[in-house]
Amino acid sequence: MFQKKFRYMAAVLAALMITQGSFTAFADEIGPGYDEQNKASTDTSVTDPANAWKKVNGVYVDNNGKTIEGALLRGISVAKWQGDIDWAKVAADDISFAFIKMMSYGYEGGYTMDPNYEKNMKGAMDNGVQAAPYVYLQTKTVEEAKAAAKYAVEKVSGYNVKYPIAVDVESKYILELSVQELTDVVNAFCDTIVAAGYTPIVYSDYSKFTTEMDTKQIHYDIWLARYGADGTYEGRTIWQCTDKGHVNGINGNVCLEFAYKDYAPVTKGTAVDTGEWKNESGKWYFYRDGGRMSLHI
């Protein structure tokens, strides 16, 4: 009898461990470039019209053929789900910028780098596509958000990043916070990015921007995910219009973006070979090329 009970308990424990492991992995996969319902955004059974989200007669048009007022540049967002990307073909298909997944950063300092991050950063930049890293944030405290941002700054060292470093706010874990708590976490991440001399941007969908955080307290640019023909939102400088786009050089569907602001001429981020954070008398400073750059807020 004891042996039977032991075997039963062991089987239950093993099942729980497998379930927990699968759940953790799934939580790490969501983000731009990932279709939660269809897993990776590679299902080509549903696509937009052939001329949707492209430049027609000198202007960008939506999936109904209407002009996208104010759209300056077309871009994409990618992660490991897009596999090997031919960046030369991407660049030739009127793609000016790309949000590239850097990592998922969780609570208690845990993080997972996207395996294609460095390859995609180099591929984009080598072909004239502005690369913009994004971090899928799962932190629950201000201090953890600051740590995530500092690590992100270290991981862009060596790249000539001119577009924003994005914080992806959609994890179910981070959404357990109150509106004020989540707003504070987002601001902490962005403040730290600014302190290092880079430009931050906040990614989420319309529902979360309007119900989960107080955007009136977030004085940073908005990267809005709202699929269809309405990308208007206060503070929105980049609009993710669809996850069913198609771009040469990428197998399957990909998220398409439109920029209403060209960051390249104004962003302060530059290639950094020796950038690092140092704690001096309880305060954090970022050093570039041997000199102190700015105070960590």
Regions found by a protein language model. Give the residues of each.
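Substrate-binding cleft of extracellular glycoside hydrolase catalytic domains
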Residues: 58-190, 194-196
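Hydrophobic anchor at the start of a short beta-strand
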Residues: 131, 199-201, 222
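Short beta-strand/turn micro-motifs composed of small residues
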Residues: 135, 204, 226
